Amino acid sequence: KSVHRFGVVYVPNGVIHSAWLPGVEGTSYELSPTLAPLAPFRDRMVVLSGLSCVSPPGRPGGFHAKAATRFLTDVTPPTSETWLDAGISMDQVLATEFGSKTQLASLELAVESNETAGACDIGFACVYSNTIAWKSANTPLPTQNNPRAVFERLFGDSRSTDARARLARIEQDRSILDSVTEETARLRGTLGASDRAKLGEYLESVRDVERRLRLAEEQSDRDVPWMDRPAGIPADYDAHVDLMFDLMLLAYQSDLTRVITFMLGREFSGMTYPQIGVPDAHHPISHH
């Protein structure tokens, strides 16, 4: 049975339009130099142009923070280091729709870490440049750039995608969850009204874990492509990107999630690309 999936790959700091967009409109276009590697998928592609998301009048500056935030929300963020106000992103709208059918509602991937904080773009909080996924107007979803951490989120701390290892992990998690459920049931009778309300919030998260475990048990015999647990973050950029795409594909094939966003870099990226003869940092060189 076919299912709907959604994936986004974000390229920061803009693109060279003359090398990105095809020269003509319609179905007979030739792929541009930047899109040429996608030639094997030419018959399944649609290249869109003419889209824009212009800042409201009186809201100058902060173009990098605005670019990442508006990409999937179409909301211009406020100029503030602490006050977060964006909007639910497109991926999270779909995650709400698809999430009940998978163990993970969504997956947020990146190549760079999101450890920057404070103001990154003329008074705008760094978080606006660090992620494109927003669960709500004030709840940004952090990205994960460590392939090992992504693998463990998908399959637990097993060493591979081997079915027996996955089932053993599920059984261990089920045992822990049963113990937690018994303890909270005993605790509930000793609490006052206020504390019971807090416990209720905690139990909501426990029920979500139960739901994911139930799905994991139902899918434990599913044929999952073999993959060893990654050791960590590859030193080589290309190897890092390839591994993240492999994990993205594995998550889809395993139906562990149907919604994934992937940032190839963050806004204001300082990454360099010596492997292609570009030793300068990404962000400064984008101001060509």
Where in this protein do the model-derived segments appear?
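Ligand-binding pockets and gating/stacking loops
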Residues: 1-288
